[in-house]
A protein has these predicted regions:
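Short Lys/Arg-enriched alpha/beta "domain-start" segment
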Residues: 36-116
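Active-site SXXK
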Residues: 266-289
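A short, well-structured edge-of-sheet supersecondary motif
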Residues: 153, 216-259
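Active-site helix/loop module of the DD-peptidase/beta-lactamase fold
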Residues: 18-53, 285-294
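Sec-dependent N-terminal signal peptides
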Residues: 2-14
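Extended hydrophobic/Leu-rich segments
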Residues: 13-14, 19, 23, 38, ...
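Long, charge-dense tracts
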Residues: 82-219
Length: 294
């Protein structure tokens, strides 16, 4: 049986609690995770390599949610029904030192009435003879242009036994339906050999501040860091100059998102952004020509 517990925004984030005891069921989860805590913990090295299949009992042992925005125009369901059960899935993953490689990164079309799922590559670290695994996941509304981004977290002991897992959502790309969510689940990990996926080299990642320093002619506040944007409604922003990828902070309601490189965005929203950016660039280029010719 599952039980519901409701988390208030005034609850302190889990930053100093013993995460290990919570995952292994020795202490209750009483508040959401602070994602900055995951970033800090992930600095611990890991030299354990293994692979297997990860899945959960889809009915949570405990779940809390807070609906922040729900426009009635789009409402065709009871919100409570959305969180009674997590969509079923099975992940094949490999822990390769600090990296966690998800081998089935495609969108998972589930039998759930409301949600599809997607997972991407994450990170691993060791602490007190346990390997901690964290990876990004996204709940995708069926037949809609909305994605709700979260973080998965669990641990494995020296016998490859798995702890409970935590799923938490604190951001989204969705104008009409927004919520905070955290659930804790009984979990399973079946070790098995998986052909190792070669981790492709990514472009060097730098901050937006690095961009302004490299290109002094670009005024600060030229991107989504401008006052013209409501930073609370910006999922991600950045700039690629052909060599380096300059990324702005992926802010959430629970600190900085630990997996800004692997953030799933709705196709329609992303297409609008890319098309608009290219259109403005082309317009500016033509205007410069007109000014020169004039």
């Amino acid at each position: 049986m599952y039980r519901l517990f409701f988390l208030l925004i005034l609850c302190p984030f889990l930053y100093s609690q013993d995460l290990g005891k919570i995952l292994w069921g020795e202490k209750p989860l009483t508040s959401p995770l602070n994602f900055d805590y995951i970033l800090a913990e992930s600095k611990n090295k890991n030299n354990v390599n293994l692979s297997g299949s990860f899945y959960i009992n889809s009915y949570p042992k405990g779940v809390g949610y807070e609906v922040i925005r729900d426009q009635k125009t789009f409402k065709n369901r009871n919100n409570e029904n959305l969180f009674l059960k997590f969509p079923e899935f099975k992940l094949d993953l490999s822990i390769q030192d600090q990296k966690v490689v998800i081998h089935n990164k495609k969108i998972i079309e589930t039998d759930d009435a409301f949600w599809d799922l997607s997972f991407s590559d994450g990170m691993a670290w060791s602490k007190e003879d346990h390997v901690y695994v964290s990876a990004p996941f996204t709940l995708i509304q069926k037949h809609a242009n909305c994605s709700h981004n979260g973080v998965l977290l669990f641990a494995l002991n020296s016998l490859n036994e798995i702890s409970q897992s935590i799923f938490q959502i604190s951001s989204e790309t969705c104008a009409y339906f927004q919520f905070n969510y955290v659930g804790i689940f009984d979990s399973f990990f079946d070790t098995k050999d998986i052909n190792k996926e070669i981790i492709s080299k990514k472009y060097d990642k730098k901050t937006i501040e690095d961009l302004y320093e490299r290109y002094p002619s670009i005024l600060r506040g030229s991107f989504a860091d401008s006052d013209a944007f409501n930073i609370g409604e910006v999922t991600a922003y950045g700039f690629f100059d052909g060599e380096d990828h300059f990324i702005g902070p992926c802010l959430t309601r629970s600190g900085n998102y630990p997996f800004c490189d692997d953030l799933l965005l709705p196709a329609y929203s992303l297409t609008k952004t890319i098309s608009g950016s290219l259109g403005i660039a082309a317009y500016q280029k033509n205007m410069d020509r007109l000014l020169i010719w004039g």
